[in-house]
Amino acid sequence: HDPVTATRAFVVTADVGEPMDIELRGLEDLDPAIAQAFTDAAARWESVIVRGLPDYVPSSPRPSCLPEDVDPLPAVVDDVIVDVATPVIDGPGEVLGQAGPTCVLSTTELGIHGIIEIDLADAAQMLANGSLGEVIEHELGHVLGIGTLWDTSWMQQGQRRLLQGSGTSNPTYRGAAGVAEWSAFGRSGN
């Protein structure tokens, strides 16, 4: 008898848990091209951050950290809510955008709400030269904690101290996991 062989192809995937969800509010008030740039930037971050955070149930829809001029929080926050707007910040040039977390959980030291403002006076030029998406990705990084939550000593129970030399001409990021990933990509420096 001839031997019998069989081949079967299959794909194995790892369960990374719940995905990262970035909810953008205020898109309907923006120029459609600008709104799309925000949507694309959020999708990019959601593809980079592969695991979401536990859902958060706020004790109040309007915690004291939430700015008065934004909508209340929903009954459940999954994972971060970002209110977006395009006010005139300083006119053409200079400040293109500004952003950061407004509500930070003491348990994770991560934001559940933040704000991004892109200077309306610069938005058309950034759309024309193709830089708007990168600027929004940069600002969204601040809402997610990059550069803004590296040191949480200002919080009552804040434990994170990832930035050495803050406020100097040579600040150094020293988070072990971040430095390891940076090195894994073949990068060097701080």
PLM feature segments, named:
Residues D2-D15:
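C-terminal edge beta-strand
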